């Protein structure tokens, strides 16, 4: 047992009673996560063809044993048409129904990105379906890429972490990744894994988000590689095209990158620190 106390002009430390208590070993929480790279290969604007493609993608990942399946961003965006006319009602739209039916068929958790129509507004959303095909979570992208603003898409107004039997799941979409606060707040909310559907992304930024917050990042992309990045920044699995499944043990407390913390690896921000020590920005301001 070590105590580091450094760089304080004045202060005291008292040691109280320290003891070791026997505890049961933490049971493994193994989860197979499936990610996907690439969209419909043809330039077809036939909605039926697109629906079938994504249903087949889920079938492929499920056949590899995936418990949690992630598809890319805006899978119902077909060609250069009007985004309002292509948007799905959630629940009830055709692409949503494919996600729901596939989740129920394979008894898997499925997350997919959709243009979502809610009354007079359109959002860039990600739907999380449970193994019964029910809507378990809905996240609306908060940081829009500038063309989306011109297309009339409305930003979401909050971040969420969803409780599942697999663990706590956070979601960020595409351009959200450019703001460190998004993944920081998801980690502070207890996320075991963050799902990152996108149309394209900067790999260096994605790796930094996993390292920054000591969490797993699952990536599915229309125009980039699919991968799962671990808290050290290494790829668990990766593919340039199609699907791949990675096995994660979410019972293991993620460790920071080995370079974090220097001689204070046992201190907050060091190797043994977890995302549970992170506070939302509001908390930091309140304490200032």
Where are these predicted regions, by residue range?
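Cys-nucleophile CN-hydrolase/nitrilase-fold catalytic domain and related Cys-dependent amidase chemistry
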Residues: 47-131, 201-208, 212-215
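Active-site catalytic loop in hydrolytic enzyme cores
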Residues: 117-189, 204, 208, 212
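CN hydrolase (nitrilase-like) catalytic-core segments centered on the catalytic cysteine
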Residues: 90-110, 168, 174-246
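Beta-strand-turn-beta hairpins that frame and shape the catalytic cleft
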Residues: 24-33, 161-170, 193
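Generic short beta-strand
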Residues: 1-3, 126-127, 226-227
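Acidic/histidine-rich helix-loop elements
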Residues: 38-50
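C-terminal beta-strand edge segments of enzyme domains
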Residues: 161, 208-209, 213, 220-288
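Extracellular beta-strand ligand-recognition surfaces/modules
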Residues: 1-14, 18
């Amino acid at each position: 047992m070590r105590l580091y106390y450094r760089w304080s002009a004045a202060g005291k430390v008292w040691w109280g009673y320290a003891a070791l208590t026997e505890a049961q070993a933490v049971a493994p929480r193994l989860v197979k996560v499936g990610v996907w790279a690439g969209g419909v290969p043809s330039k077809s604007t036939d909605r039926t063809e697109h629906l079938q493609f994504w249903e087949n993608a889920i079938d492929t990942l499920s056949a590899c044993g995936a418990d949690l399946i992630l598809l890319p961003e805006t899978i119902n965006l077909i060609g250069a048409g009007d985004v309002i006319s292509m948007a799905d009602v959630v629940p009830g739209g055709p692409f949503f129904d494919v996600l729901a039916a596939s989740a129920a068929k394979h008894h898997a958790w499925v997350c997919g990105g959709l243009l979502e129509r809610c009354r007079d507004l359109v959002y860039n959303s990600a739907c999380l379906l449970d193994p019964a095909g029910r809507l378990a979570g809905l996240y609306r992208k908060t940081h829009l890429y500038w063309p989306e603003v011109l297309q009339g898409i409305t930003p979401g107004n909050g971040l969420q972490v969803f409780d599942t039997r697999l663990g706590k799941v956070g979601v960020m979409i595409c351009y959200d990744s450019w703001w460190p606060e998004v993944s920081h707040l998801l980690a502070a909310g207890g996320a075991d894994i963050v799902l990152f559907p996108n149309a394209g992304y900067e790999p260096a930024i994605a790796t930094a988000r996993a390292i920054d917050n000591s969490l797993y990042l699952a990536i599915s992309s229309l125009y980039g590689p699919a991968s799962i990045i671990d808290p050290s920044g290494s790829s668990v699995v990766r593919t340039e095209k199609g699907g791949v499944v990675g096995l994660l043990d979410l019972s293991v407390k993620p460790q920071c990158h080995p370079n974090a913390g220097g001689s204070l690896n046992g201190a907050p921000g060091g190797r043994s620190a977890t995302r549970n020590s992170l506070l939302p920005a509001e908390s930091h301001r309140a304490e200032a």
